[in-house]
Amino acid sequence: YRRQRQMCIRDRLDAQYLVWLVVFLALAFDYINGFHDTANAIATSVSTRAIEPKKAIMMTAALNFLGAMVSTGVAKTIGGDIVMSASLINSAIISAALIGAITWNLLTWYWGIPSSSSHALIGGIIGAVGWSVGFDALNEAGIIKIFLSLILSPIVAMIGGYIVMKVLLLIFGRFSPIVLNDRFRSMQIVSAIMMAFSHGSNDAQKAMGIITLTLLSGGFIDTLEVPVWVKLCCATAMAMGTAVGGWKIISTM
């Protein structure tokens, strides 16, 4: 009986270590995501000299933190819409998904290639779950919804950018380029603020969803509500990563 009890305690400790490993990897993913995707928010503003690079990065870091704290809708989607049930996965599966996503992010950062951390994470989860448990464990409806958003995002943005540019040319086409540049620089700062805030409110929540899903599958929490400490940790990791800055990708952009 004593030996059996010792084995149970050891198994429980091993499970706890794996959960904390996932927490560490998820925060590492958030940190890397911060400096990997910083360019998305500030590349245009920096390239046109609307704002100094250091000021742009610090502004983006602060707004990423604030954005990460506003809601948990994306976190619940990541935590609840990809897998049919939290009981079907474990910390080892989630660790594999995170390691795959982190590796891809680091490679693309090293090569200076802009890429989506969201695509990497979603692909890592699907691959790890499909290999270890089987693709039947995946929530088909949830994955279709996520894939549609990933595919449609650049298409909708491209169409929106084309339409807005057409309208701007019709309104301001006759103005002097010098006058326009001065006025639009301030508007670029506003757009960078909006981009940074939305980046934090979207991307930081992916790590929140991963950690919350792990805590739920391990029996540490009872619902898919994101704990406050998870929000704070993910927001801080994202902000710190952003403060470091991804100069290679900014140069490419």
Residue spans of the language-model regions?
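Multi-pass alpha-helical transmembrane bundle typical of ion/small-solute transporters
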Residues: R10-T252
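Single conserved hydrophobic/aromatic residue that forms the stacking wall/gate
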Residues: Y1-I9
